[in-house]
């Protein structure tokens, strides 16, 4: 038992580029991150996420503060760095800090205030009272939105969802398209190492619009319970 993520290999017979998806959870056991990085950076190109902004530093306290929990004993995902012998080209497939800040300013003030207050409280709750089991239950994700996700929709949070999810989905798909549409790139194997919640957009692009098919799936253990 524990939390797992699915490593997916996709292929379109009409194109040379094979794609591997690594849906990420940003907290896990060291072995999980080591395996993912070693595998991903054996590809020709790696698309990665990361918004460098003081805003994201504040709102990611909800999981970053788990690092202090002796009960959970998990580590945070480290910065992307290729192994010494890797020749992979790293592509930043995310918003810049300035772009994210511009979208964040469109979020209603009371929603921003709530996020700023709630994030550290959630982080402290995880640190002091959380268990691996409770954290795993809160991070299950299917290919399609669940009933609970649909029911949680609120007009007040549209701008928040746009900043945190949708705008970043668009940028990721744009960067993916640039790689796939470049006939002279010489790329044969492409990896996407990105938050699990963003992989739905990638799968829609690859399966529905570009004719890719899942060739192989493999479970990776983020952490055991």
Go through each PLM region and give its residues:
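A cross-kingdom marker for long, charged
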Residues: 186-225
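Conserved, well-ordered alpha-helix/loop/beta-strand core segments that scaffold catalytic motifs
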Residues: 166-167, 173, 179-183, 190, ...
């Amino acid at each position: 038992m524990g939390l797992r993520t699915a490593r997916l290999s996709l292929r379109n017979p009409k194109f040379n580029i094979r794609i591997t998806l690594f849906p990420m959870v940003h907290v896990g056991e060291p072995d999980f991150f080591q395996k993912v990085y070693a595998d991903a950076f054996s590809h020709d190109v790696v698309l990665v996420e990361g918004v460098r902004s003081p805003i994201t530093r504040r709102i990611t306290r909800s999981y970053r503060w788990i690092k202090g929990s002796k009960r959970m004993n998990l580590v945070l995902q480290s910065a992307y760095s290729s192994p010494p012998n890797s020749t992979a080209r790293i592509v930043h497939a995310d918003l810049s800090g300035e772009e994210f800040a511009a979208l964040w300013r469109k979020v209603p003030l009371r929603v921003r205030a709530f996020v700023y207050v709630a994030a550290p409280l959630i982080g402290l709750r995880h640190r002091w009272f959380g268990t691996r089991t409770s954290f795993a239950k809160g991070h299950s994700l299917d290919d399609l939105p669940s009933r609970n996700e649909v029911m949680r929709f609120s007009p007040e949070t549209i701008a928040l969802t746009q900043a945190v999810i949708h705008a970043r989905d668009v940028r990721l798909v744009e960067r993916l398209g640039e790689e796939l549409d470049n006939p002279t790139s010489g790329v044969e194997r492409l990896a996407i190492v990105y938050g699990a919640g963003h992989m739905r957009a990638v799968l829609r692009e690859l399966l529905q619009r570009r004719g890719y098919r899942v060739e192989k799936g493999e479970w990776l253990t983020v952490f055991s319970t």
